[in-house]
Amino acid sequence: MHLSLGAHWLIIAYIYVEINTKIKNRFFLKVILITFSSLIHFYFTAMLLLMNFIFSIYENFKSKDLKNFLKEIFLLMIPLILTMYSVGYFSIPVSDSLGFGYGIYKANMLTFFDPTSGLGQKNWSLFLPDIKNTKGETEGFGYLGVGIIILIFILIFYIIKDLKKIIQKHIKYFIVILLLFIIALSSSISFGGLKIVDFDLPIFLYAPLSIIRASGRFIWPIYYLLIIFSIFAFYKLKIKLRYLIFILLIQ
């Protein structure tokens, strides 16, 4: 078992720091989280780095501050690289870090609705049946739960008229979710048990992606972003409390 992969608090903590603009020294807290994640498991480091890179590009290019963008990259990468070096990340050749599995250990397009894609094929729902998927997709387990799924559909009904404005206002989060989802799906995309896309990547792309061969794990930040923003939107829209009670009961 990969016990270190249970440190999902790193993802939640990073999202909290990113969302809460009232926190002082947010950038340095992010640096600490990303650097510390390298001491736990590199998959968390890769996820947080990717999210941080997109957020940083968006914020700094929005303000047209290229100098600050480069400064942030430097201040992040120096402690991260030094930490990784000190614990032995670079003690083996890069070629030895490449692995088999990218395109196999991935997520399914229906992962958020599939209650039985996890370890041991346990069904985590009393209401939804198993959705057939392909071999290796247990790594991309991201079942949201019936309650959250219903909540998301309720929210879509409430915000459909202003959806374009909401996307524009929170575009950086939509970009992050889309990019993470593409990585999680890999180059072999399945919809349930149906494989709809399967192609070979050129070696210059496959080589670095094979380092994160279990790309399905990149569904985790999306999972938490969807839950956090669904609950936040529920509160902001002042939806009747009885809906929330019902959602909690069936979650």
Regions found by a protein language model. Name each.
Residues 1, 84-93, 115-124, 174-213, ...:
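Membrane-interface helix-loop junctions at the exits of transmembrane helices
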Residues 1-13, 39-43, 47, 142-144, ...:
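Membrane-interface micro-motifs in multi-pass membrane enzymes
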Residues 7-29, 226-229:
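Specific aromatic-rich, kink-prone transmembrane helix
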Residues 64-88, 99-104, 108, 172-179:
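Hydrophobic alpha-helical membrane-interfacial segments at the cytosolic entry of transmembrane helices
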